[in-house]
Regions:
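Short glycine/proline- and acidic residue-enriched helix-loop micro-motifs
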Residues: 23, 104-123
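Short, well-ordered beta-to-alpha junction loops that form the rim of enzyme active sites
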Residues: 54-58, 80-81, 148-152
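Short, surface-exposed amphipathic charged segments that create phosphate/polyanion-binding patches used
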Residues: 89-97
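Active-site-adjacent alpha-helix immediately C-terminal to a catalytic or transition-state-stabilizing loop
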Residues: 69-72, 130-173
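Active-site-proximal alpha-helix that buttresses catalytic centers in soluble enzyme cores
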Residues: 2-77, 99-101, 122, 165-168
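A short, well-structured juxtamembrane/interface segment
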Residues: 40-43, 125-135
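Short catalytic/ligand-binding loop motif for oxyanion handling, primarily in non-cytosolic enzymes
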Residues: 10-13, 60-63, 84-87, 116, ...
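A short, structured active-site edge motif that brings together acidic residues
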Residues: 73-89, 110-116
Length: 173
C-alpha cells in the first residue's frame, strides 16, 4: 500500500506564513499543491496502482484526481482516511457541494455533513487508523492501493509525519 499526504493547500500556505490558523474551511490546493499532485503522477509512474482511496476533503480529492486520470482508475471516497478534526481546514464541504465538483465519484455512503462536530483526540484518530488498517489487511489489492489522506490521519496510521505531496510505501500489512 502506498500512502500519500495531499498537496499544499491554501490553509497550509497561510499557516506557514503567519503561524496562525487562517480560518479556512475545506481549502483548495495552491498552485504549488496542484504542481505536487501532478508531480506525483510521474513519481509514481513505476508503481502499480489499481485502486485509489481518498478522503472527501477537497485538497485530497484534488491531489488524487490527476493520479487517477493518468492511471485510468476511479477514486473511492472513504471517511476512514479523512483528517482529524483539529483546525478550521478540517471542516469539510457538504456532500452536495463536493458531488457537484466530482460528479463521477460515489458519495452515496457519506452523509451531507460528514466531518465531526468536535475535535478528535489522538486515541480516536489512532482507533480510526487501526480500523482502516484492519480493513486493508484483508484486501487482496492492498499492495497496489494508493491512499490520499492527511497529516493527522497518516501520523495515526504510520506514526510518522508527512510533508505536503509526500508519499511512502507502507510496510506489508
Amino acid at each position: 500500500m502506498i500512502v500519500m499526504r495531499h498537496g499544499q493547500s491554501e490553509w497550509n500556505r497561510l499557516m506557514t506564513e503567519t503561524g496562525r490558523d487562517p480560518g479556512l474551511a475545506d481549502p483548495p490546493l495552491t498552485a504549488a499543491g496542484l504542481a505536487q499532485a501532478h508531480a506525483a503522477v510521474a513519481k509514481l509512474a513505476d508503481r502499480r496502482i489499481t485502486r485509489i482511496i481518498a478522503s472527501p476533503y477537497r485538497r485530497a480529492l484534488q491531489t488524487a484526481t490527476p493520479i487517477a486520470q493518468a492511471r485510468g482508475v476511479g477514486i473511492e471516497v472513504s471517511l476512514l482516511v479523512r483528517e482529524r478534526k483539529a483546525y478550521s481546514c478540517d471542516v469539510g464541504s457538504p456532500k452536495s457541494e463536493i458531488e457537484r465538483e466530482w460528479p463521477d465519484l460515489d458519495f452515496s455512503h457519506i452523509p451531507e455533513i460528514w466531518w465531526p462536530a468536535e475535535n478528535e483526540t489522538t486515541p480516536e484518530v489512532r482507533a480510526r487508523a487501526e480500523q482502516f488498517y484492519a480493513r486493508m489487511r484483508d484486501a487482496e489489492d492492498r499492495e497496489y492501493t494508493l491512499i490520499v489522506s492527511h497529516w493527522g490521519f497518516l501520523l495515526g496510521l504510520t506514526g510518522e509525519s508527512f510533508e505536503n505531496g509526500e508519499w511512502r510505501k507502507l510496510k506489508e500489512l
